[in-house]
Regions:
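Solvent-exposed, non-transmembrane regions of membrane-associated and secreted proteins
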Residues: 1-120
Length: 120
């Protein structure tokens, strides 16, 4: 479960990022860690399950909480960036524990919002 208190987001995270997964909630990028290092998660920005519609409004220092079968961790937002849809650099493994959130940029299909938060 992913919680973003400043945006009133409380969403279950499923494995995978296909359209059927994102129709239910947020989706974990299967090639990234679910716990140690970089855990990358995608979500829709509009429609019935638009849990990530406002992530571009997050501020540095806002908190994100991720609960998995391994426990609960709290993260602090360190960056919010608009990136190219082909930029996969934020999916790379990291030494520090972090969560990276992705969603589409409304009406700009070539771009994505990417939010990085590190464990506190």
């Amino acid at each position: 479960t992913l919680k973003i208190p400043s945006l009133n987001v409380n969403v279950k995270v499923y494995e995978g990022t296909g359209s059927s997964v994102l129709a239910k909630g947020a989706g974990h990028f299967e090639d990234t860690s679910i716990w140690d290092g970089n855990c990358a998660i995608a979500g829709h920005n509009r429609g019935a399950n638009c849990y990530f519609g406002d992530i571009h409004n997050l501020n540095v220092g806002d908190t994100i909480t991720l609960t998995t079968r391994l426990g609960t961790r709290t993260y602090s937002v360190t960056s919010v960036n608009k990136i190219s849809e082909t930029d996969n650099s934020l999916l790379a493994p990291t030494a520090e524990n972090c969560v990276t959130l992705f969603t589409c940029v409304r009406n700009q299909s070539a771009y994505r919002w990417a939010v990085r938060a590190v464990e506190v």
